[in-house]
């Protein structure tokens, strides 16, 4: 009797795991990205070079790659949107496309958006997060490290202009 009960209990437990295993797996997204200075006419640059400190009237560019759980690039056929949300609440929609965008043949494809820092914007660190939305309206958010020295920072001064 005891061995039959144990066998029945084991069968029920195994069937319970089989049912749980057939559930849809959670689809996770993975984010890669950086911040660079976006070119603005008559500014000297350097452009498309990693930095986290920007002066007013310079343009911050976010370069973002989103990967699916299989490690494949999640482009605009996989994601409905990618949005950068600044710490002050501004939302900047990113676009998927080739880079460089003009001139030379593309070397890469990723999501990007740029924002020109207003002349009167306060100095200091400015947090942000990146929100990817899948076609089924599922959102996933990524945020950089929260230590002030590694955050996007607006610093005093004017951008250098070409002479």
Language-model features: where?
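Aromatic sugar-binding surface patches on proteins
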Residues: 103-116, 122
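Sec/Tat signal peptide C-region and signal peptidase I cleavage site
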Residues: 17-23
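Bacterial N-terminal signal peptides that target proteins for export
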Residues: 1-9
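Short flexible loop/turn segments that cap and initiate beta-strands
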Residues: 54, 58, 66-97, 128
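Beta-strand-rich domain onsets/edges
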Residues: 23-61, 65-68, 158-163
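Short beta-strand elements
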Residues: 138-163
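Bacterial N-terminal signal peptides
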Residues: 8-17
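Exposed beta-strand face motif in extracellular beta-rich ectodomains
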Residues: 124-130
